[in-house]
Amino acid sequence: MPSFDIISEVEAVELRNAVDNANRELSTRFDFRGVEASFDYKDESVKLTAQDDFQLKQMRDILRSNLTKRNVDPNAMEAKAADQTGRTWHQTVIFKQGIETDVAKKIVKLIKDNKVKVQASIQGDKVRVTGKKRDDLQAVMALVRSGELGQPFQFDNFRD
């Protein structure tokens, strides 16, 4: 029986490349001349450091554009609240890895509500979809892509 897995992962190499490109762009931008601002990548999260909160917003936009250039979906970003220590502002941006249980339940409910003849089961941080016809599986892929679940999804381990 054909099956595939729905996963949500961000490639660490592409993420690091996007952060490096964003740091390079910061050093060349006119509005960041003479300003201490940087992106620090560590363990699937990026720490933004700047002197003003509006610069943090600009830095998030720079990071988003560089992620898009590297084919990393910016919807995987989850920005924490900005905090100020002295003259500098800090903000941590975490990248979602894996599908959380409540999002996985929404995916399974979305598939079952659409009455496609497939079975969806939650297996850890991924959702396995099994069906008799390849066309049904492709319909589920289109359904999950169109569903607004606040997280990017990839399809892996397609078996015929």
UniProtKB/Swiss-Prot annotation:
One Pfam family cited in the UniProt record for this chain: DUF520
Task: Name the domain of life.
Answer: Bacteria
Q: Which SUPFAM superfamilies match?
A: YajQ-like
- Keywords assigned by UniProt, alphabetized: Nucleotide-binding
Q: Which InterPro entries match?
A: DUF520, UPF0234-like_C, UPF0234_N, YajQ-like_sf
Cite the GO molecular-function annotations of the record: nucleotide binding
List GO terms (cellular component aspect).
cytosol
State the family named in the UniProt similarity comment for this chain.
Belongs to the YajQ family.
The free-text function statement in the UniProt record for this protein reads:
Nucleotide-binding protein.
Name of the protein in its database record = Nucleotide-binding protein VS_1405
